[in-house]
């Protein structure tokens, strides 16, 4: 997983295990359909508390999805994961002859982590919201007996009427709800808390020219953070409120991540996975660039 080719694209808690989802679970060519990976919560807390100095050792969980990648036209891997008990939900991205597509699929994870097995017959398309390449539904929420998928780009010029799509736990479509305009990308989200709130990664890569904008309402209201370089990357966590009528921005400042500046040529880090950690803050993980990074971000003071 430390290699960038792991391309970790999602995080989710399964009980007391943090599950890391590679975009292509068979990236290491370990046979079969590959693996997802699990880190025990106790190991993560011990590492953060300084009582464990050794490296974190992920547990491979065999991934079973027979023939699924070959059935999806233009398959480009998995993008999001969430759990409801032992039921797993994942999104898939595809670049087809007719444009970008996203799909939802479900399966079961074994309590002993012996396998995560997808039911390939449940593959369900998520309607696209723009014609921009390499964009699909990259965040996934479980809200009671509903699943909520969130599209990657929701800025005013690229998606003027953003929506979140709803499904039941059998993946039957259950309508849509409104989603707020927000510039740049949404690449993952935490689970809902008891008040229906969640945080999401809001990221901008300067090479993503179709998402370039002169107007960023969040930055205009709250500022960009002291390490921002004009024209450079944006890395922030933004809080949202979910209810059955729609999703709205919470009126509070984003958490601005300290940017690496010229160390990465102003390009930033491609954060693709996000979970809360025991009231302490957040765990984030990068996709391919600049490498696989698992990071801890503390809760803002006063929370």
Indicate where each model-derived feature is located.
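Sequence/structural signature of beta-propeller domains
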Residues: 1-303
């Amino acid at each position: 997983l430390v290699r960038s080719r792991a391309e970790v694209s999602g995080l989710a808690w399964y009980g007391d295990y943090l599950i890391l989802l590679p975009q292509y679970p068979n990236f290491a060519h370990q046979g079969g359909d590959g693996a997802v990976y699990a880190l025990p919560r106790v190991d993560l807390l011990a590492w953060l508390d300084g009582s464990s100095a050794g490296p974190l050792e992920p547990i491979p969980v065999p991934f079973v999805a027979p023939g699924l990648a070959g059935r999806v036209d233009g398959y480009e891997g998995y993008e999001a994961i969430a759990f409801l008990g032992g039921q797993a939900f994942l999104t898939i991205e595809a670049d087809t002859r007719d444009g970008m597509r996203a799909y939802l699929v479900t399966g079961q994870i074994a309590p002993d982590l012996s396998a995560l097995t997808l039911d390939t017959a449940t593959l369900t398309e998520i309607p696209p919201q723009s014609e921009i390449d390499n964009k699909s539904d990259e965040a996934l929420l479980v809200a009671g007996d509903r699943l909520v998928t969130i599209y990657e780009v929701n800025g005013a010029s690229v998606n003027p009427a953003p929506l979140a799509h709803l499904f039941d736990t059998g993946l039957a479509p259950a309508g849509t709800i409104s989603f707020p305009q927000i510039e740049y990308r949404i690449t993952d989200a935490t689970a809902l808390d008891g008040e229906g709130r969640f945080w999401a990664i809001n990221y901008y890569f300067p090479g993503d020219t179709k998402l370039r904008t002169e107007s960023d309402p969040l930055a205009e209201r709250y500022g960009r953070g002291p390490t921002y370089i004009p024209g450079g990357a944006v890395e922030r966590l933004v809080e949202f409120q979910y209810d059955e009528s729609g999703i709205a921005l919470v009126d509070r400042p984003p958490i601005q991540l300290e940017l690496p500046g010229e160390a990465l040529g102003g390009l930033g880090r491609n954060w693709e996975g996000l979970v809360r950690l025991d009231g302490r803050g957040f765990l984030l993980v990068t996709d391919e660039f600049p490498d696989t990074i698992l990071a801890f971000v503390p809760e803002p003071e006063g929370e």
